[in-house]
Amino acid sequence: MRNRGIEYGIQKTNFNEVLSIAAISEHDWINLESIVPESQSVELNISCPNLDVHEDTTIFNGFDAWPTIYRKWCIVKVPPTASYSLLDKIVKLGFTQIHASNTLPTDKGGLSGAILLPHTRRIIRYLKREYDHVEVIAGGGIKEAWHAEFYKDLGADHFSIGTACFNPFKVWRTVNEINGDPSIGVHQT
């Protein structure tokens, strides 16, 4: 599903929101970096399974230019199948915020939900063991507050709720439960 493009995305994204972008071809990171304001928080999706190409876009020119002190958020959204060497590479390039994880690639697109739990758990454990300074955003199967609590106990700093969004009544109940549970310590950005 294609969107309306980067200019439209920038126009519709408030200064305190995160703009999610992906590179499709080799020079996209360079082109996007020259267009996106330096102060705009971004999430770099390096693994969108809905694209025709399934490759590691961190090898594309300009990926390493994104980390900056001017952005509050410069998140890399990794695939659930991310290798430890890919995670090492991302951190060594200067990224300190990682979203684990994207949807699981299938022949028919990306699969989300509870199937991501073991993948997200593996990524959180590795990052917190090897790079405790990295902020981890955990996602995958969060439908109830206890799912966020599970990820928090593994070391997640923030949470991404996608699965619950398929039911608008469920998502608000889940967000309110998470925000109302002081043991989880969730804050909205």
Give short role names for the model-derived ranges.
Residues 10-14, 64-71, 91, 124-132, ...:
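Surface-exposed amphipathic alpha-helices with a cationic face
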Residues 107-117, 152-189:
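C-terminal helical cap(s) of enzyme catalytic domains, especially alpha/beta-barrels
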Residues 42, 98, 159-160:
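Hydrophobic residues within beta-strands of alpha/beta enzymes
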Residues 27-36, 81-93, 125-131, 142-161:
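Catalytic cores of alpha/beta
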Residues 1-57:
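Active-site beta->alpha loop and helix N-cap motifs at the rims of alpha/beta catalytic domains
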Residues 15-19, 69-82, 127-139:
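Short beta-strand/loop segments at the ligand-binding rim of alpha/beta enzyme cores
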Residues 21-23, 46-48, 76-80, 102, ...:
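A cross-domain feature marking catalytic cores of carbohydrate-active enzymes
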Residues 46-59, 80, 85-134, 168-174:
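Glycine/Thr-rich beta-alpha phosphate-binding loop at enzyme active sites
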